[in-house]
């Protein structure tokens, strides 16, 4: 495709500790393939493979408008025989620039993850095989950052490392293995989201990025985000409402919502499923009454399609079960944000 052609085919083997290969795109940005020893190696046939299969792709710093290019790169990897996913202990790690965050915005950010991490664990189908490489948020850190309400980043840093400040200079600090990694922020100015399973489905990858950016936007724009852990007996409805509150509204984000909701159980249109059952029963009674009246008056009955259109919830922002099958992403983008 024209987007994929934006990445040159010529590779450069730089070698080094991670046996690095790089490919430049037309903007002279490096896309890298590097060794990653944490991956379980299988080939495309599912057979055990050598460590030459133990690699990951690192993109350059991208902006929102680069997502179509990233999607084409993902498709090219899949077409070339690349494999990834929970079985391989592989994940998608997304780094978000946060060098202009205030202490309150960092507090908002970690509170969002602390409050919604149970939802995210289910929605993202977090693999148990990867639990060695990230956990839920540190409850002691969340309690202290909300009790002390730090006003500067150094104080937040002290809370993050629990006073063990030498860890900030260690690349593999144990503090990095959480759903929202601030160790990366203190070292490089960007935090890391580690919750996503690896995927070579371009639509899933886009939905992962869009959710990460929406959470970032909420952390920056909301005055205060509570750490109170969200609970629900209708996860699909509650998670959908949260996505809409994050701004993932309308056709632009419909496909993202579909991917993010497709693993959740529950009634998407009704907070209490029994209300949906009652509403459908009432609609059925209404249909039958109208049919009886139509037969008595010898007129055509109201069509079932018309009845459904008049009585069901607006679908404009609600993915249905059928939309979750054989789905491919749309590629129309709107806003522009840095990643």
Roles of regions detected by a PLM:
Residues 29-47, 106-197:
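Aromatic/basic-lined ligand-recognition segments
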Residues 250-296:
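Long, highly charged low-complexity segments enriched in Glu/Asp and Lys/Arg with interspersed Ser/Thr
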Residues 306, 314-316, 321-339:
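Non-Sec secretion/translocation targeting segments of pathogen effectors
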Residues 13-63, 76-78, 83, 90:
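Polyanion/phosphate-binding surface patch
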Residues 85, 118-136, 217-234:
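Flexible helix-coil linker/hinge segments at domain or subdomain boundaries
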